[in-house]
Amino acid sequence: MKKVVFFLLDFYRYGLSSFRQTLGMYGVCRYYPTCSQYCREAVQKHGIIHGLYLCLRRLMRCHPWGAAGWDPVPEKSNLGIKRTKKADHPLKKKVSLMRVMHLFFK
């Protein structure tokens, strides 16, 4: 399945993108690495599902009014998903009624 994704990315990169330039539509990518390189690297590092998700997020950021510059593929441990343990969640802590009453009626 990765080979199909890589084939489509290479087809765009070397076929369609080059054809656009011959028609005079010069679209220079705002980021480094380019979006097609980013997608290829994301699929290699994270697999098809997470890689295509990261690729879609990148394509949504790539517009004329967006940011530009260095935008590497995140490492596996940093996918933007932060999880908390149930015990550490602030709403899961048990507080006795006497303690709450003590705070209100000092």
Swiss-Prot record:
It is found in: Cell inner membrane. It holds the Pfam family YidD. Its main location: membrane. It comes from the Bacteria. It is a peripheral membrane protein. GO terms for cellular component: plasma membrane. The keyword Hydrolase does not apply. Keywords: Cell inner membrane, Cell membrane, Membrane. NCBIfam families: membrane protein insertion efficiency factor YidD (TIGR00278). Belongs to the UPF0161 family. Could be involved in insertion of integral membrane proteins into the membrane. HAMAP family: UPF0161_YidD. This is Putative membrane protein insertion efficiency factor. It comes from Methylacidiphilum infernorum (isolate V4).
